[in-house]
Swiss-Prot record:
Function: This b-type cytochrome is tightly associated with the reaction center of photosystem II (PSII). PSII is a light-driven water:plastoquinone oxidoreductase that uses light energy to abstract electrons from H(2)O, generating O(2) and a proton gradient subsequently used for ATP formation. It consists of a core antenna complex that captures photons, and an electron transfer chain that converts photonic excitation into a charge separation.
Source lineage: Bacteria, Bacillati, Cyanobacteriota, Cyanophyceae, Synechococcales
Organism: Prochlorococcus marinus (strain MIT 9515)
Similarity comment: Belongs to the PsbE/PsbF family.
Assigned keywords, A-Z: Electron transport, Heme, Iron, Membrane, Metal-binding, Photosynthesis, Photosystem II, Thylakoid, Transmembrane, Transmembrane helix, Transport
Name of protein: Cytochrome b559 subunit beta
Gene this chain is encoded by: psbF
Cofactor(s) listed in the protein's UniProt record: heme b
SUPFAM superfamilies, per database record: Cytochrome b559 subunits
Amino acid sequence: MSNSQAPMQAVEVRVYPIFTVRWLAVHALAIPSVFFLGAIAAMQFISR
């Protein structure tokens, strides 16, 4: 390791986008799922 004057510059910083196709797919499924779980949980407390 004679090349010690270059301190760890091989790692390039990558900025990833937030809104991707995967993000849209996950939230398109997760948001209604949480809504329906809340609705089903609320139905358990309805007394007739």
